[in-house]
Amino acid sequence: MLNKVQLIGNITHDLEQQYINTNEGKIPKVNFQLAVNNKDTTQFIPCVVFRNQADNMFMYLHKGSKVYVEGTLSIEKYINNESENKTSTKVIVQRVIFLDNKNQ
């Protein structure tokens, strides 16, 4: 089975870094949204990145930064506070390439 997502877009908000507890200790995590432009529309894709790539994104990127991300699609089903069935979709990022010009 293949589950691979490749996107190029712009980060929609300044990044905030969090730390989560794991069996390996605390690891950095950054949630962000990527604006991906198509011909007529813009899609806003939720993404999450961990470990060193989260550190690097937090240090060097900001709202508007253009990036290439590669990862897997995660779909979670849950029941909200109103007892409605909901679905949450996000990209678990495994690779990030910064696409902005270094002089920007």
Curated annotation (Swiss-Prot):
Gene3D superfamilies: Nucleic acid-binding proteins. GO terms for biological process: DNA replication. SUPFAM superfamilies: Nucleic acid-binding proteins. GO terms for cellular component: nucleoid. Transmembrane segments: none annotated. GO terms for molecular function: single-stranded DNA binding. It holds the Pfam family SSB. Residues 1-100 form the SSB domain. The keyword DNA-binding applies. Keywords: DNA-binding, Plasmid. PROSITE patterns: SSB. Homotetramer. NCBIfam families: ssb. This is Single-stranded DNA-binding protein. It comes from Onion yellows phytoplasma (strain OY-M). The lineage of its organism: Bacteria, Bacillati, Mycoplasmatota, Mollicutes, Acholeplasmatales. The gene is ssb.
